[in-house]
Amino acid sequence: MVKSIRYWLQALSLTDEKRGEKGKRYQELSEDFGKILFENDKYFEDLGTLYLLHYKLVSNKDLATTWNLFFNSIKATEMTKHHMEEGVKQLILNIDPQYEISERSLSDDCNCLVKTYFAEKNDLKNPEDNMICPFSDLGLIKKEHIRGKDEIIYKTVPERNKLDKLIVLYVIMDNLGDKQSTTIKNLIEDENNIGSVFNLDKNTINYYIDILRDEGYLRVNRTAGLNTIYPTDLAVNILDKYYSRL
């Protein structure tokens, strides 16, 4: 249990592993993320916090490989469970052709991923459902049972009134790093950017960019169809600004 908790704390970027006296390992809240969430929403009650945790999980390729590949590299928006497993398997083999994949572990990982985002009707009867399906309110995955056929898994675009513009801006700025600008194309196609992480299509991305531009966080140059995006001086300390409104 302790190892499992430690794993998820690191996979969600909430803690960094340190070594103390005699090399003993311990967990410390991450400076720019874990501490901010602990100070502002330690029980993860805010929907924006859950979107942030989802982003950190999906962008952690080392500790959450299945999540990373599913959201970033599988481009299909609907698939059977079998096709999902085969897609993840092939992507892993593309990275390391010699890697020995356990079919059981792969199936368990894919089941865990779907379960994280989609609550079955029977699960909803359990008041502790959020512990089973912590990201079910994000609206990123749904599942449909068709009689006589395999169940279908869908990647879905979250409702605009759920995914806050400042959460979107945080992910944009986190991906921007030291660069001075980005493009709509980058936001749509780049690994770990808002298009892949939140299943956002071009229209929805433009919706958020227009709002962030109108509120002064971004400057957009649409000359010659380049759609280049520049952050303004307001686009700093995004998490502090987000949580100050709660």
Predicted regions and their residues:
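Donor-sugar nucleotide-binding helix/loop cap in glycosyltransferases
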Residues: 1-246
